[in-house]
Amino acid sequence: MEADWDELSRIPVPAPSVHALPTIATAIAFDDVMELLWGRITSFFGPELQRYTSVRAHPATEPVRQIIFHDRGVISLSPKSVHMITRRGLTQWHIAHEEMTDLRCMSFTAQTNRIIVAGCQKSMFTIDIDKGIIIDKLHTEYNYTIMKKSRYLCAATDTGSVNALSLNDFSVVKSWKAHGTAVNDMDARNDLLVTCGFSVRHLGSPIVDPLANVYDLKTLSPLPPIPFHAGAAYVRMHPKLHTTSFVASQTGQLQVVDLMNPNAINLRQANVSFMLGIDLSPSGEALAINDAECAIHLWGSPAKVHFNEMSKEAEFGDVAPRPPTLDWSPETPLSMIGMPYYHERLFSAWPSHLVFEVGSPPPQVDQALIPYLRPAELGHHAPNPKKTRRYQVENTRALASAEPALIAPKFLSEKAREQNKAKSEGAISDAAEALAGAKINGETDDDPLLKYSNVEIKYSRFGVDDFDFRFYNQTTFSGLETHIANSFTNALLQLFKFIPYIRNVALHHAASSCIFETCLLCEMGYLFDMLEKASGQNCQATNLLKTFSSYREASNLGLFEENLTNKSLSAAIQAVNRFFLGQISHDFRMISPSSDDLDHRLATVASESIRCMFCQNEIVRPGNSLVNELNYPAIDIKQARRNPAFRFSNILRASIEREAQNRGWCNYCRRYQQVAIRKSVHRMPQVLMLNAALTNPICRRLWAIPGWLPEEVGIVIEGGQILCFEGEDLKLRVQAKMPGLVVYDLVGLVCEIDIPEHQKAHLVSFINVSISSREPETKNKWHLFNDFLVTEVDKEEALRFNQPWKIPCVLAYQVQDGRHAMDDTWKDALDTTLLFRDWSLNGGRPVESRVTLSEEEKPTPGTPVALDTEFVDLEKAEIDVKADGSQEIVRPSKSGLARVSVLRGSGIREGVPFIDDYITIKENIVDYVTQYSGIKPGDLDPRVSQHNLVPLKVAYKKLWLLLNLGCVFVGHGLASDFRKVNIQVPKSQTVDTQYLFFHPGKNRRLSLRYLAWAVFKEYIQEEPADDSQGHDSIEDARMALRLWKKFKEYEDAGIVSQILEEIFREGSKLGFRPPPRNGVPTVLSRPGTAVTMQNNSGRNTPSTSDVAGAAASAPATPRQAFRRSIALTPSNGSFAGPGTGDFFSGSPLK
């Protein structure tokens, strides 16, 4: 090893497939013909390790054990097969044999066209490389793990011995006990053999030997070993220097030593955490290291690194010629592009009389038959269910082209246009929609699976507000929208919401002082409050799912939607259930570390005893669990109906206690022993969450038994053991008032719906909404929640599992005493500290006009506040352009809240903002839309922003507090703002000037910019000279507040309709836009009246000096304005500044 040897390159090992996670390379080797390094049947070219070829030679479940090279190609070995490819990746042959069960190693024999393969099995095979066939099968008594060819064929066994085999008949010539436990690596060249391995020290676990053993193959005798204190794990002999070897440890220490002179050593340290193997190039100038972090390191001298002395030139793919440059602008006619030159008839001109339909798709196997399939000589067979007539053939081609049964309803805008049609046509349309609604509600038998179909939101040019959600939901319970990342959890969130104890804890926690940005329990409280306030309107869990997506632990567990390609939805939602419950328990303790209220409600308190079966030593540790997985016994389905061991209550008891025997570490024996694990239960929770863990098709037959899942179970704890009862047994014990008996009600369950025909698997929930009702109900009411499709179902339908497409996943039971326990005292215990103090991430100063609320200004029910928000684009809309040129919005643009401004709506400081927060955004921002939002790059970056930056959680909580304090929000276009903020505000707490100034006979909504000019003759939201300016949310909120005040004056005067007529008449002339500033504006007073506006500054909005002067001359107490109900006086064209009592002076009604 020269002095300049160092790491030349490091590359990650490519993943085994496109969507798989990276894994380690189990074998690496240098090619002796080309400048290639091979690993996982992938080759890398040259010192830069440029990827050359990659093939899948063996099944994904079989790791590559060894790679050797021949002039004709590359030979790889897996546990059950041998494969040969050319260096360009073409397969030459593949050999598998029934007695190839655990192949470990291979080597060339005395004949260069033959190899011998062996392993931990009783047979060895010799293979002809040229023909790709097995020549001979040899019986052996040894299990071989490594083979190296030199003077003899050196083979290491799994017991730590090394056998020297004859190259002619493979008989054992000499055997050495090289290591105590196993041989980890060895190499043989010329007359020397060097081995590395493991031994057991003092009855402990095997450790790496600190010596590398050396043997002379000429005399078949051992030589002095090589000392290596770091632990000799890997070894390679130098191809040129016959007595020089490379020895490496598992921690990355490299030692180059002369076997004849062990004192002459050269040390290096590789930057690896754990080494898995090394290989030396045939030239001796390059060393490859394979580590446990899925990387390959190349060491060598930068000046003269070559893999071989004389290498063949590697062949690379031809560079595809670049296509000619064409003018493909929208203005270019398609005829200018032209067609390629051809001299014969094109295949596309195939005559119609030669088109035939052949090869229809095979009929799909009935899913109900899968549990009954039995293997046969060719395929599988099952009893005929006799669902069709004899010789009846299924038209699979028609089924393949069939459309889904559930078709989206018409857009609301389309329905509004159709109202102008003839009454007869309208009646037909209404009847068709009523029939479709009847199908969804399950009142027809045409398609009973209709309500279980996938539901998707369709978008028109008016956005999501134009979608008819009421078509899917006629109940008072709100559904959750899709098209949000990780929205597959909607069904589980609905289940949590209808569990009273979880709902109460979440809302009380949300009302506390918690402002942790990633608190999942707070987000659940906000979501549950939103669902209750919505009363049947559609909602979305955007903020909660964004918080869920931010957890690195959830990403590592593969719980996100993008990780579900190779994972069933049922397994995923059960893992999410465990994560959610564990995370909300953690979040609860962040605010109340000394309280065990949540554990009392959710945790099964138990202790787990672990007893060694050898020494009988027993240890006890806590065994609390938030989720219990059902553990099914070995089932004889014929006795399932009669055997009480297969009842749900008995399976539940065995699942909670969960006795098992496994191998585990015994501290007394200091080794792994067979241990017995037993759980003793001390307290059951008030909410019993269960994962169905239904992976065995045989166990699914238990669920198919009618009434197998009980609505009620009773549990008694006696001496650390539990007793479970159901059905008549439970009724008898309830009547006898059994001591300690706790009865649980089934609140609901989450199910996976997997209908193969044109449907993708999705999740729904069945919930008994009567348990969470505020008024006691005599009858249980079950509802289906399929995202935003909500409908009532029968109890029998909810608890029926005899169809293979309905798979139970998560169950929730709650103590019967918790029925109707809806606690709303959190509204009286709101922690409003956040409203009365400044909070900033970056120490930025808010606008000077902002004044934080004082304690005397604490909002009360009915307090008006003006609101305006600004947003930035996080994702652009996804638009599908069809062949006819029409466009369909597949997914709308995604916005992020960037600024929130809230102003006082009454009092001496009326119009003064008390909230003006900029929100930091961690996602990628694709467009700041500065001309509309006023947000510029850097405004939301805590490192450079000069504004008051807060997390989304803080800004949202301020709005949520104002909502639950009873404030009335005044603004323009509030519905869009509330939707993007993801908050639900009742209509009784909303004043939207967009609807106040709405003419019933005019199908048009007026912009805030036009209303400001039409009512006050003021210009706002003007187009800036450059893109660095934009809307001001404080200005917009203040204008909406003034418009509301003015509208109330119009109402008192009884002239609303006349004012609206004049506003719309004037707007139709101007295109509903303010006229240019250089024109002569007129003041709206009453129909037919106009007054010229005078302003010395030349602007219709007052200058800064005018505002300051008006504010300075304002009296200490606001003037008491009076209203004239009949006579109107013109405006004087001026107004006082915000925060003064005369802020709305200049009204024609003052």
From Swiss-Prot:
GO biological process: mRNA processing; nuclear-transcribed mRNA poly(A) tail shortening
Exonuclease domain residues: 865-1043
WD repeat residues: 96-139, 270-309
Alphabetized UniProt keyword annotations: Cytoplasm, Exonuclease, Hydrolase, Metal-binding, mRNA processing, Nuclease, Repeat, WD repeat
Cofactor names: a divalent metal cation
Low complexity: compositionally biased ranges: 1108-1120
SUPFAM superfamilies to which the protein is assigned, alphabetical: Cysteine proteinases (SSF54001), Ribonuclease H-like (SSF53098), WD40 repeat-like (SSF50978)
Cited SMART domains: EXOIII (SM00479)
Family annotation (Gene3D superfamilies): Cysteine proteinases (3.90.70.10), Ribonuclease H-like superfamily/Ribonuclease H (3.30.420.10), YVTN repeat-like/Quinoprotein amine dehydrogenase (2.130.10.10)
Composition skew (Polar residues), residue ranges: 1091-1106
Chain positions covered by the region annotation Disordered: 1074-1150
PROSITE patterns, sorted: USP_3
Cofactor note (record): Binds 2 metal cations per subunit in the catalytic exonuclease domain.
Domain of life: Eukaryota
Residues reported to bind a divalent metal cation: 868, 870, 977, 1036
This enzyme's EC code(s): 3.1.13.4
Localisation per UniProt entry: Cytoplasm
Activity regulation, free text: Positively regulated by the regulatory subunit pan3.
Domain comment, as recorded: Contains a pseudo-UCH domain. This ubiquitin C-terminal hydrolase (UCH)-like or ubiquitin specific protease (USP)-like domain is predicted to be catalytically inactive because it lacks the active site catalytic triad characteristic of thiol proteases, with residues at the equivalent structural positions that are incompatible with catalysis, and it cannot bind ubiquitin. It functions as a structural scaffold for intra- and intermolecular interactions in the complex.
Subunit structure: Forms a heterotrimer with an asymmetric homodimer of the regulatory subunit pan3 to form the poly(A)-nuclease (PAN) deadenylation complex.
Family stated for the protein in its record: Belongs to the peptidase C19 family. PAN2 subfamily.
Protein name stated in the entry: PAN2-PAN3 deadenylation complex catalytic subunit pan2
Organism: Aspergillus niger (strain ATCC MYA-4892 / CBS 513.88 / FGSC A1513)
Gene: pan2
